[in-house]
Amino acid sequence: MANVLVLKSSINGETSLTNQLINEFLAARQAAGHGDRLTEHDLSAMALPTLDRPLFAALRGAVDPQPAIREVVALSDQLIAELKASDLLVIGAPMYNLNVPTDLKKWFDLVARARETFRYTESWPQGLVEGVRAVVVSSRGGIHQGETTDAVTPYLRAVLGLMGIQEVEFIYAEGLDNRPHGRDAGIASARAQIARLAVPALVVEKLCLRWRPFYFRVI
């Protein structure tokens, strides 16, 4: 059984294709016998604060007398605790103007904290989030995978890697606005990727036993 942290960031709520594909991925894992324990956030409904100078300083350890700032630091601590307690992080990241949604960026601004999720060394930052892998679901109107127009993929790989999450899989639903058949093809491709990633729990367990000590968790 795995602890799964789910982050939905679409502004379109339940009509969002990204959110629907996340639900399908979680249902596929359940059908495969994983029995996940879910913690789910709709980031677009959380009204997360925008990073500004006082908040940035407080997140780096400065003492701020403002109650509102202290509340946000406490929220940051809570979100970080959720992340560190998870085995699998599922991120919904639809492409908006070539990048991630604003609310998802706000979440990262609260959890990517020096001395909490990464630390500086003499050569390179070291991630402090251990034993977590990530799956990103990203829908796009056009086809951007592997192109310079895709800022979503490199940003998420970089910020997750900064915190120590190196194993990141992407489920892309692309070309959704291409007519006449782009949407159907994009959804079919995403569902094929979901089927590939939703490996039956028994198969994962056998791999873990076979390749010990390289596999530490059944996720």
Question: PLM ranges: what are they?
Answer:
Residues 111-117, 159:
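Gly/Ser/Thr-rich active-site loops/lids in small-molecule metabolic enzymes
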Residues 120-163:
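Short, glycine-/small-residue-rich phosphate/pyrophosphate-handling segment
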Residues 1-93, 99-109, 113, 192-216:
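N-terminal beta1-alpha1-beta2 submodule of the flavodoxin-like/Rossmannoid cofactor-binding fold
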Residues 3, 37, 132-133, 167:
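Residues at the starts of beta-strands that form the adenosine-phosphate
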Residues 9, 139, 173:
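Cofactor-binding loop segments of dinucleotide-utilizing enzymes, especially the Rossmann-like FAD-
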Residues 11-13, 141-144, 177:
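Short histidine/acidic/glycine/proline-rich micro-motifs that form metal-
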Residues 82-87, 132, 163-168:
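A structural motif corresponding to the C-terminal end of an alpha-helix
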Residues 146-211, 215-219:
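Glycine-rich phosphate/pyrophosphate-binding loop and the adjoining helix
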